[in-house]
């Protein structure tokens, strides 16, 4: 809205042109989401406390987590609100990518919100039935995959790009649809599994969104894309604003989620953020680079798959407890050490992911 207003009034007051540049809108998108998240966070926490929407803690997990019982959750709604307002202010509302991003964010967020609501308000400790939850997530992911497939104007928009290789590409055709479906559902659940310690999931989300913001900015420029041998995607610049808003809202949420956390994001935040990052990666054709940058999320998800598979096949567990962060906790690592080391790993992985821009 503010972008459209600045565009319309720039002919009368030329300094407003500065607000129409993509770089300006990226910065303003991040700042808007950050400030909204910080200033609205306190009120949301008090509301959640008043409504007694406190976290349920399993008694078979690390004993240090028992003190977290009752901490307000569903704080992810604050993140979604901040991102949405920021996008409506600074993104180009004529761009289909703006609405695609919001559709995924709100769609996955709605499933997570329903799950959290049933757990916390209706006191149904299991929330949505597993099949129900999977069906709803699958529906949103499949609609997104179909949207992107039929939106594609050029073959490159449905081509899988291999990092570190300049000419290794695979035109997926109709297989693009199930591929996108798997990327979205996989990423959303991976972030959800990572969200088990104070600040553990949100900082990697911020860091990965920063990396994807750079990819989106460069892919949206035909000149940069040609120089770097990456796909040129018209309109991808709006996804850079989306990434900036995610990073800003995430940092604002971390203000309250840092140890000891005053609020947790819940499924409403984790599912939506994972899918949002995956959507950006799909649009800019950097799914494999996204897997590298989000290596912490991948490791957390794989640890659960390995643990379950090993127990079912051999009757033995590979890890002390899954997801992976609990394995280290039960090994004697303090919560803050696990969290910060996972942050450091993510910084390194994001840099490795960005290095694919030149190392080909």
Curated annotation (Swiss-Prot):
Pfam families in UniProt: Glycos_transf_4, MraY_sig1
GO CC term (a single one): plasma membrane
Subcellular location: Cell inner membrane
An annotated GO BP: cell wall organization
Highest taxon listed in the record's lineage: Bacteria
Single annotated GO MF: metal ion binding
Name of the protein in question: Phospho-N-acetylmuramoyl-pentapeptide-transferase
Similarity-based family: Belongs to the glycosyltransferase 4 family. MraY subfamily.
InterPro entries assigned to the protein according to its UniProt record, in alphabetical order: Glycosyl_transferase_4 (IPR000715), PNAcMuramoyl-5peptid_Trfase (IPR003524), PNAcMuramoyl-5peptid_Trfase_CS (IPR018480)
Alphabetically ordered keywords of this record: Cell cycle, Cell division, Cell inner membrane, Cell membrane, Cell shape, Cell wall biogenesis/degradation, Magnesium, Membrane, Metal-binding, Peptidoglycan synthesis, Transferase, Transmembrane, Transmembrane helix
Cofactor annotation: Mg(2+)
EC numbers: 2.7.8.13
Protein purpose: Catalyzes the initial step of the lipid cycle reactions in the biosynthesis of the cell wall peptidoglycan: transfers peptidoglycan precursor phospho-MurNAc-pentapeptide from UDP-MurNAc-pentapeptide onto the lipid carrier undecaprenyl phosphate, yielding undecaprenyl-pyrophosphoryl-MurNAc-pentapeptide, known as lipid I.
């Amino acid at each position: 809205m503010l972008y459209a207003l600045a565009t319309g009034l720039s002919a009368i007051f030329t300094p407003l042109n500065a607000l129409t540049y993509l770089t300006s809108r990226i910065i303003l998108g991040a700042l808007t989401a950050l400030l909204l998240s910080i200033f609205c966070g306190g009120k949301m926490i008090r509301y959640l406390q008043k409504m007694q929407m406190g976290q349920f803690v399993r008694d078979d997990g690390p004993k240090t987590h028992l003190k977290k019982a009752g901490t307000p959750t569903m704080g992810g709604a604050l993140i979604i609100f901040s991102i949405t307002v920021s996008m409506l202010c600074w993104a180009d509302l004529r761009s289909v990518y703006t609405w695609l991003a919001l559709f995924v964010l709100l769609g996955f967020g709605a499933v997570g919100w329903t799950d959290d609501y049933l757990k916390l308000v209706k006191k149904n400790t299991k929330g949505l039935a597993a099949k129900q939850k999977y069906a709803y997530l699958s529906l949103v992911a499949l609609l997104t995959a179909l949207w992107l497939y039929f939106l594609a104007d050029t073959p490159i928009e449905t081509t899988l790009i291999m990092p570190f290789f300049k000419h290794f590409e695979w035109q997926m055709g109709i297989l693009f649809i199930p591929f996108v479906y798997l990327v979205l559902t996989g990423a959303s659940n991976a972030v959800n599994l990572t969200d088990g310690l104070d600040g553990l999931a949100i900082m990697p989300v911020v860091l990965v969104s920063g990396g994807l913001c750079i990819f989106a900015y460069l892919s949206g420029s035909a000149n940069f894309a040609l120089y770097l041998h990456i796909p040129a995607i018209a309109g991808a610049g709006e996804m850079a604003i989306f990434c900036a808003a995610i990073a800003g809202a995430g940092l604002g949420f971390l203000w309250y989620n840092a140890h000891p956390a005053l609020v947790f994001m819940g499924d409403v935040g984790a599912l939506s953020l994972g899918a949002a990052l995956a959507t950006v990666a799909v649009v800019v054709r950097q799914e494999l680079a996204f897997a590298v940058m989000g290596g912490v999320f991948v490791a957390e998800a794989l640890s659960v798959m390995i643990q379950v598979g090993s127990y079912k096949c051999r009757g033995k567990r590979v890890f002390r407890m899954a997801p992976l962060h609990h394995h280290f906790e039960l090994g004697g690592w303090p919560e803050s050490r696990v969290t910060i080391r996972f942050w450091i790993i993510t910084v390194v992985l994001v840099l490795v992911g960005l290095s694919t821009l030149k190392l080909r």
